[in-house]
C-alpha cells in the first residue's frame, strides 16, 4: 500500500512538472493576461514602407528576424499618450534581446506635431508616418491605440486593442516566449 502511495505521488509530481514546463501554455496565459487576441491562423504581416521622422523610408521587412510590437497611434489619442512611456521602457529593457517597437502615427499632415510629441516623451524607437492612413486600413485599425505582435518569422502572432502596460512583468514574459 505504501509503495502504491509513493508511486501515485511521484506520478502526480511528474505530471505537474510537465504542465508547468509547457511553454505554449505559458505563452497562452501571458497572451490572455495582456488581452492579446491570437489569429486563427498565423499569416505573414502585411509589409509596408513609410517615411520616418528623420525623412528616411523604412519597411516592415527592415525589422525581419526580430520580434516586433507594431503600434498604431496618434498625438490626439489620450490612451496612446498613456502607453507610449511604457513602450519606451519595454524597448530599453528588451531591445538587446531582439524586440523592436515600430510606432505608426496616423496623424494627418502633422509631422512637426509628431516630432514634438516624440521629443516630449523621449521616445527612441522608430516612429513612422502614415498620413494617408493606407497602412492603418491594411491592418484594419478601428480604434487607437492598436498593436500587433509579429514573430521573428514575420507572422502575426496577435493583436491588442487599447492601451497596455507594456513594461509589466507579464508583458516582458510574453515577449520572452515570442523571441525564443
Name these PLM-found stretches.
Residues 72-89:
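Conserved redox-active cysteine motifs that mediate thiol-disulfide chemistry
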Amino acid at each position: 500500500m505504501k509503495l502504491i502511495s509513493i508511486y501515485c505521488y511521484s506520478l502526480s509530481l511528474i505530471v505537474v512538472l510537465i504542465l508547468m514546463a509547457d511553454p505554449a501554455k505559458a505563452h497562452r496565459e501571458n497572451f490572455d493576461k495582456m488581452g492579446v487576441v491570437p489569429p486563427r491562423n498565423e499569416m505573414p504581416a502585411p509589409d509596408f514602407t513609410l517615411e520616418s521622422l528623420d525623412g528616411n523610408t523604412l519597411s516592415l521587412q527592415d525589422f525581419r528576424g526580430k520580434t516586433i510590437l507594431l503600434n498604431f497611434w496618434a498625438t490626439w489619442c489620450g490612451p496612446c499618450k498613456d502607453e507610449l512611456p511604457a513602450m519606451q521602457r519595454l524597448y530599453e529593457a528588451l531591445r538587446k534581446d531582439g524586440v523592436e517597437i515600430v510606432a505608426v502615427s496616423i496623424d494627418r499632415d502633422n509631422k512637426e506635431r509628431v516630432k514634438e510629441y516624440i521629443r516630449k516623451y523621449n521616445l527612441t524607437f522608430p516612429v513612422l508616418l502614415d498620413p494617408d492612413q493606407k497602412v492603418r486600413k491594411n491592418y484594419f485599425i478601428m480604434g487607437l491605440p492598436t498593436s500587433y505582435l509579429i514573430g521573428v518569422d514575420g507572422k502575426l502572432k496577435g493583436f491588442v486593442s487599447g492601451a497596455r502596460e507594456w513594461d509589466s512583468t507579464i508583458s516582458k514574459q510574453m515577449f520572452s516566449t515570442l523571441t525564443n
